[in-house]
Amino acid sequence: MSVVFVTGNAGKLRETNHILAPTGIELTSHKLDLEETQGTIEEVSIAKAKAAAKILNKPVLVEDTALGFAALKGLPGVYIKWFLDSLGHEGLNKMLAGFEDKSATAWCTFAYCGGPDEDVLLFQGTCEGTIVPPRGENNFGWNAVFEPKGYTETFAEMSEETKNAISHRFKALEKLKVFLAEKAEQSK
């Protein structure tokens, strides 16, 4: 089974391929400049999947990530990319400087749309953790400042295997794998 993963983010593509590799699902990537709607992670993911399916006229997969700080009632949330671009890792830490609570939740939502006129299905995963001063190689996104609960390393300090076995993306992809395996079986 082949699915187009609509992303221009090499890190997301690499992680997703690594996690899906055992399934035999063929993932090809296609970069599209989709309108960034505002709303919840679910609303954003659905809008992106529908738009991509309409443009490409085939089954598509899009992914959206959010990082919410408990002290800020879930901010920056789906806007983490823009916060990170504007403030950097140090700025994310400064946002929490006046708060004792440094806990955060990472969300990953994969949205699958089988075609232009089909419903969008969502597959979500979360990972609880803490925002810490940047540590580890800044390999992508906010990995250097997110330390998952129960671990002493940030995502950036972890091996790819460790991170890909516990992350919010892994948890969402585990749900997606079940769906895609069933879909592949039905198409035989």
From Swiss-Prot:
One of its GO terms (biological process) is nucleotide metabolic process. GO terms for cellular component: cytoplasm; nucleus. It catalyses: ITP + H2O = IMP + diphosphate + H(+); dITP + H2O = dIMP + diphosphate + H(+); XTP + H2O = XMP + diphosphate + H(+). This is Inosine triphosphate pyrophosphatase. One of its GO terms (molecular function) is metal ion binding. ITP binds at residues 7-12, 48, 64-65, 81, 140-143, 163, 168-169. The lineage of its organism: Eukaryota, Fungi, Dikarya, Ascomycota, Saccharomycotina. It comes from Yarrowia lipolytica (strain CLIB 122 / E 150) (Yeast). Mg(2+) binds at residue 36.
